[in-house]
Amino acid sequence: ELCEKEQPDMIVGTSMGGMYAQQMRGFKRILVNPAFTMSTNSKVLKTGEYHFFNGRYDGAKTFRITRDIIQHFNQMERQQFKNITEDEKQLCWCLVGLRDTTVTNAEALFKKNYLADHVIRFDGEHQLTEKVIKKVVLPLVERLRMKE
């Protein structure tokens, strides 16, 4: 709904956000270390209470992951790659950190469902650094903007 309302030029999502961004059909998308299979990856999604990495507008400091939440993600994950058209394949790119030990199957799943030449490997880990943003993400954003 938000994308339909705002009509963004491009969507960039990392980790879990990359999995969500992949499903936002009709928009140019860059997925960075996308966590396509969170519900079965114990490093990404396990029950318990956690602290947010960054501040939130609502002031919340923690969040809880329950078994119901994990089941919800599992159902969504099983549907996420359905009905991807050839046009959609042109709109989606995947950036994969060579030293990412959190999400290790993103490249294989992306290549299975999208275009292999839309995968870019970079020297980095799971979480983005300022260096990776400047040297990898922003140049791809500019390159894709120039294609408009």
Located regions from the model:
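The alpha/beta-hydrolase serine catalytic core
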Residues: 28-30, 34-148
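Active-site catalytic motif of lipid deacylating hydrolases and related acyltransferases
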Residues: 1-5, 126
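Short active-site oxyanion
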Residues: 7-10, 91-93
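Aromatic pocket-lining residues of Rossmann-like dinucleotide-binding sites
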Residues: 24-25
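Residue in the alpha/beta-hydrolase core beta-strand immediately N-terminal to the catalytic nucleophile
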Residues: 9-12, 28-30
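Gly/Ala-rich beta-loop-alpha elbow adjacent to hydrolase catalytic centers
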Residues: 12-21
